[in-house]
Amino acid sequence: MKTTSEIRQSFLDFFHSKGHTVVPSSSLVPENDPTLLFTNAGMNQFKDVFLGLEKRPYTRATTAQRCVRAGGKHNDLENVGYTARHHTFFEMMGNFSFGDYFKHDAIQFGWEYLTSPQWLGLPKEKLYVTVYETDDEAYDIWNKIVGVPTDHIIRIGDNKGAPYASDNFWAMGDTGPCGPCTEIFYDHGETFWGGLPGSPEEDGDRYIEVWNIVFMQFNRLADGTMEKLPKPSVDTGMGLERMTAVMQHVNSNYETDIFQTLIKEVAGLLNVSDLDNKSLRVVADHIRACSYLIADGVVPSNEGRGYVLRRIIRRAVRHGNLLGAKEAFFYKLVPTLATVMGHAGEVLTQKQAHIQKTLKAEEEQFARTLERGLALLEDALTKVENNTLSGEVAFKLYDTYGFPLDLTADVCRERELTIDEAGFEAEMTAQRERAKASSNFGTDYNNVIKVEGQTDFIGYDNLEAQATIVGLFSNGKAVDTIQSGESAVIILDQTSFYAEMGGQVGDSGLISTEICNFAVNDTQKYGQVFGHIGQLTSGSLSIGDKVTATVHATRRIAITANHSATHLLHSALREVLGDHVAQKGSLVSENILRFDFSQPEAISKSQLEEIERIVNRKIRENIQVTIETMDIESAKKKGAMALFGEKYGDVVRVVGMTEFSIELCGGTHVQRTGDIGLFKLVSEGAVAAGIRRVEAVTAETAIEWLHNQQKVLQQSAEFLKADSNSLVEKIQQLQDKAKRTEKELQQLKDKLAAQAGSELVKQANKINGVNVVVQKLENVEVKSLRTMVDDLKNQLESAIVVFGTVADEKVNLIVGVTKDLSSKVNAGELVGAMAQQVGGKGGGRADMAMAGGSEPQNLDNALKFAEEWIQAKL
């Protein structure tokens, strides 16, 4: 039985053998295509090539493209887990011709890959094809050249109410490239309900589309006229999950190897015995979408792609809750996913820590409100009228508890209820209008904080302020007093604490009186007021109390150094890489600075070194940092750069470090660049298509980082008994030695396997005159089994060979049959029957097949069964 990874690789290998360039999957975040929320088809990355706007160094390409359909026009989210084939994430295998081959080769390639025993080997009688009603050329190729009988070819006309509106006619839009398509369907058999394509029962599970070839041969003009393209092209798609289900002889994608592995992992984590539970399917599907989206740079948020990701995570968490999850579990699935995805999981392995950290934080954040939200929903469901949940309740769940509408719809669906979506939209519109009409005073900040007036910030020049408490909030409510031990948000009339803005984190410190201490952990801005977030450690505080607000000085100084260094870094990046560099996001904390920016390609080591040299040179120059306030037009004339995502008023603050760096900025900065001390880049990489990220440390943190690096270098040199200057050379020598040893070990294993094979020839039994070898082998690697079987078949010339081994508590079975006997004894049938004896599944070709199982204690019985089975066949 072929695994998903093997099928993926075989597709790429086949088309590579046909002269196609293997192109890596593009990001799930489409590059330079604002019309798409996510990559949802293999052709997305080639859109400009098909339109003639871009040229590639090849005219034939093949890909294994990761895709997401959740949100926007292509939204499968609500069906995921409840059907056999809906997914949020899927892989689309594709082969493409850009003005190279056309219908004849495209059809022949597809048929060869699907039916040739060398590749997938599907039975031809199980396949049906559809063509566009007037595409006689495609029909004739299928019938006269490929040899598909006429009763297996179906013409599909305009079945969507307009000319050229058909399941078998594709168009990029109302105008532009378009053309007919031909599809291949697999017949799962009479045991499944459903009719042929084009019939009233076509949506059943019997006939499943597994291959689609689009022939881009026309350009549709605005008046509907079709003109032939000078260089027609081909776009082919094969859904990997669907094809895997076919190859593994199951009807549901969730029964295939990848999903079964994930489902069992979820069940094990949550102690679930019913593996058919639909919530297991939901979680198994959603971990794929979430992990790959995060790997491609999407982060959970309340808008755009980030909100779709958040919706998927929260749906998974809610289904985990249904399965009995009591703590964060979703993030624990990432390592298993990375492993089971094979080569396609390498990107997950590289970013595993980031993916798990993001998922865990989001899961824990939602868990805090999930229980309360579900309680509210359960109460509301007992009061529904006309089987419809009110839009008002659905909106409250969304607004207060973070329940996406489709999550609430999920719960209602389980009760056979619907949601008043129009009422939900009306509530959403009303909230937008309220926000738009409100003033800066008395505004509902984050649905909780309502304070008249504003907080005056005096912290640029003062780390301590005398202030009056004008607002107190605890447990999500406005209060008059807080007591020792309570967590709260304190609003002051003025403060020296900087609130998180422009990438700079909020200050921490102490708010105190003679008898009270409130430890501030963070500072956030709510409209025009600053919220000091923390815990009262002694005494009590009330609105109107006079307090002293003292910023944690050491932390502020470290943050300030990192912020000024970020400005120098931005200018250095533009100097080395070019003016295309634009800030796309940043983080300025006390420990590290992070800077995201537009950059289409990786940065070389020499470029990174030059960037670092420039920043440190500017630090050594000890430049005076100037702060000016001016109108926005004057700032623009001065050449000031604006921060990504920030909004500016008519009057702005301009931070300058001579002409080298001039930016609009409201953050805190050093007085002279020399105060930064030292700058050290510590990482660089991609976070999304066309977006790079660098991280750096400064001052004491940079010195500590260098000390740690030096310590690692010294320890490594001592461990390898080498001088630190020759450490690289020593490592290279060890690597070369390891490769030689590995090669010698493999040669020894092959030699031992050959010797074992020679011994087994002597032990061959005769059953009705046929050489039969049935053996349980010890200490033989799985990859050596096939070699041993082939060697025995060659030595015996006419034979049936059956081996069984146990490794890591798993059974491995292999059956080999020489071609003269394969008509009597089918290796695929035999290994499949044996696999059932050891709790597994398997199959393969008539002459060679492998299987696995999970019950090693039954291997001896399986081998005895094989002997009896062979004897019966012979």
Curated annotation (Swiss-Prot):
GO aspect biological process, one term:
negative regulation of DNA-templated transcription
Which cofactor(s) are needed, names only? Zn(2+)
The record's SUPFAM superfamilies line, in alphabetical order, gives:
Class II aaRS and biotin synthetases, Putative anticodon-binding domain of alanyl-tRNA synthetase (AlaRS), ThrRS/AlaRS common domain, Translation proteins
Keywords of this entry = Aminoacyl-tRNA synthetase, ATP-binding, Cytoplasm, Ligase, Metal-binding, Nucleotide-binding, Protein biosynthesis, RNA-binding, tRNA-binding, Zinc
Reactions catalysed according to its record: tRNA(Ala) + L-alanine + ATP = L-alanyl-tRNA(Ala) + AMP + diphosphate
Enzyme class comes to: ligase
Q: Which InterPro entries match?
A: aa-tRNA-synth_II/BPL/LPL, Ala-tRNA-lgiase_IIc, Ala-tRNA-ligase_IIc_anticod-bd, Ala-tRNA-synth_IIc_core, Ala-tRNA-synth_IIc_N, Ala-tRNA_ligase, Ala_tRNA_ligase_euk/bac, DHHA1_dom
Q: Name one GO molecular function term.
A: alanine-tRNA ligase activity
- Where found in the cell? Cytoplasm
**Known role:** Catalyzes the attachment of alanine to tRNA(Ala) in a two-step reaction: alanine is first activated by ATP to form Ala-AMP and then transferred to the acceptor end of tRNA(Ala). Also edits incorrectly charged Ser-tRNA(Ala) and Gly-tRNA(Ala) via its editing domain.
Identification of the protein by name: Alanine--tRNA ligase
Gene transcribed to yield this protein: alaS
